[in-house]
Each structure stands twice: as C-alpha cells, then as structure tokens.
Amino acid sequence: MEDGVYEPPDLTPEERMELENIRRRKQELLVEIQRLREELSEAMSEVEGLEANEGSKTLQRNRKMAMGRKKFNMDPKKGIQFLVENELLQNTPEEIARFLYKGEGLNKTAIGDYLGEREELNLAVLHAFVDLHEFTDLNLVQALRQFLWSFRLPGEAQKIDRMMEAFAQRYCLCNPGVFQSTDTCYVLSFAVIMLNTSLHNPNVRDKPGLERFVAMNRGINEGGDLPEELLRNLYDSIRNEPFKIPEDDGNDLTHTFFNPDREGWLLKLGGRVKTWKRRWFILTDNCLYYFEYTTDKEPRGIIPLENLSIREVDDPRKPNCFELYIPNNKGQLIKACKTEADGRVVEGNHMVYRISAPTQEEKDEWIKSIQAAVSVDPFYEMLAARKKRISVKKKQEQP
C-alpha cells in the first residue's frame, strides 16, 4: 500500500504500469470535472444575469408603453410621436392603425380625434383602421354597431364626414351590389344614426315610425328607392337595440365644465313666469349651461346652440341685454331642458332666451363667444349636401 492506496503484491511490472496510468487518468478526469463544474456555474450566473437584464428591459418597455398610452389619451399626436421615438411603434399607417384598433388602454374619444385629423398620415391611418374592420355579410346596422364601438365620433362636421365616407367605401367594398354607390351608403348610414337618436333620446318626443323612415330615404339609391324590406330590417334593429356608444372617463360633466369657453353670472328672464333670475352660466361644447350656484355639480338648464342665432336687444327693465332665438321662427320653442325643483327634467318653454349681462363689456364678450360656438347641426348639413349630389347625378344621367 502506497500513500494509502492499496496495491496487490502479485502484480507484474506491466500490470503495475497500467494501474498507474489508470490512477493518473482518474486524477485528470477529476480535475476536468471540477473545471467543468466551475464553467457551468459561471455560465449559469451569466444566464441568470441575462434573464434579469431581459426582465428589466421588458419592465422598462411596459412602463414606457403605459406612459405612451397616457400621453395619447391627453394628446393623441404627441402620444404617437412618443411611442415612435421610443421604438414601441412603427411609424407606418398600418402599424398605428393596428395599435388604435386593438385599443388597449386607449381613450376612444382620443382615437376618434386622431382618426379625424386631416393631415396626410392621419388620413392614411384612418383608411388602414377602417380596413381592419370586416363588414362582409353584415347588414348596415350591424356594420355601424361594430364601427362606432371602436372609437367615439368627434363633434366636428368635417371629421365626421371623412370618417363616414371611409366607412361607406369599406362597407360597399365588403358587400358589393347592396347599394348602387357609396353616396347611398353614406346617406343611409347618417339616416340610421339620426334614427337611433330620435328613437332613444328621452328629450325627443316625436318618435319617427317606419313609414316616415322609409319616406325620408326615398330616392337616395342613385335616384331610385331602396327595398322597403331592407329599410324595415334596419328600422327594427335600431328600435329594438340602440347603438352602444363608447363612454370614456373624460366625458362626464365634471370634465365638460373643466375648461369652458366662457363662464360668469348673468340674469335670465323666465319662460312662463317673466321674472329675472341670477344664474351662473357656462359656455362649452356648443351648449350654454346655467346653474343656481357655482358649486352645483348638475346644471339647472341646458341650451344647445345648434341652429340658434344671437342678437342685441333693448329692454326697459334691464341693461346690456341679448337674446338667443331661432331664425325664421314660426312659433316653435327652442329645444332645451331644465331641472324643476322636485328633480324632474322638463323641456324649456322659451321661444327666445333673453339674458342680461352686468356690463356692456361683458355683454359684448358673451355675444362674441356665443357667436363662435353657435353651430348648425352637421348631420343635416352633410346629408343635404350628399342628397343634392345624388339628385344632380341622377339628372345628368337622364336623356
């Protein structure tokens, strides 16, 4: 036995040499195994470091993406710019459209505002966005339900016009032969949206029946009439189930009154009882709201400014007066509503709204601000223009 290692006494010199070689090889293998263990340990440490680094990168990317969505919801153009600059989004219409279509964490009002812009990139994104919608074999109401749920229509007439034109083109491409032209699809789409408002808005008392809906849409199919069965199906669908319009957190009344065009104390002459009452007025979003106190969360009355005009008037009882009125009025009341003392919401009772400002200067400022806010209903304007185009085209085709 040498160094504690047993060695049989009857080994030949050759066997001893072979045994020595085996022992040496064993020692070499043990050293090699130890070296491999150390290398494996180093490799595992490197892998763990890489994984931690990748996890950190993923976390950082997710944080930047969340920041980009927040920026988009506050300012769509700056939000897209931030995402592109941080390589979170490719600067192509198709990729931006896909990002908006998925809509994860995005404010649908902001999506609508971005899609409605007239810049070249926005227009290309709008068409790419519409192309992501599959309308094949859907009737018009079904297609509109899908389309109008993916964003919130902006308020500006020109933006609405571009978006509904893109919708009509896509619908006709997916469903060839249903309508003779995109103009027909465009006009009928607006008629359906207006029908939805008329049937389901509690402030609209005069609910149109099927016959009136059919009559409204006579001659819009390149001068011809659409099948009554088609119109009946659309009417029944809207009557039975209104459009679901996406609501965002930013659309509550608090947000509406957060940054008004003008606000201040004015005197308002009553409708039935001709007494002057001091009210806090807020002008925003083409509406005039009035409150009993500045701290009230809900307005006492709402006056939509669509189709109204404003003029200065002299009143023997109050100075600095102006009026809101309907041009060429034939006895109809201004469409408005107010809240009674018992909480009931009722229609207003004014053919004109007479208002008195504290000073001449404030009167002039209110008149200027209201004139800038007064609007004609874009739906009716655009429908009239498109129907006129269809009519002219039909006359040109006649021999």
UniProtKB/Swiss-Prot annotation:
A 1,2-diacyl-sn-glycero-3-phospho-(1D-myo-inositol-3,4,5-trisphosphate) binds at K268, L269, G270, G271, R272, V273, K274, T275, R279, Y290, R300, K338, N349, H350. GO terms for biological process: regulation of ARF protein signal transduction. GO terms for cellular component: cytoplasm; growth cone; plasma membrane. It is found in: Cell membrane; Cytoplasm; Cell projection; Cell projection, Growth cone. Residues 386-394 are annotated as: C-terminal autoinhibitory region. The keyword Cell membrane applies. GO terms for molecular function: guanyl-nucleotide exchange factor activity; inositol 1,4,5 trisphosphate binding; lipid binding. Acts as a guanine-nucleotide exchange factor (GEF). Promotes guanine-nucleotide exchange on ARF1, ARF3 and ARF6. Promotes the activation of ARF factors through replacement of GDP with GTP. The cell membrane form, in association with ARL4 proteins, recruits ARF6 to the plasma membrane. Involved in neurite growth. This is Cytohesin-2. The lineage of its organism: Eukaryota, Metazoa, Chordata, Craniata, Vertebrata.
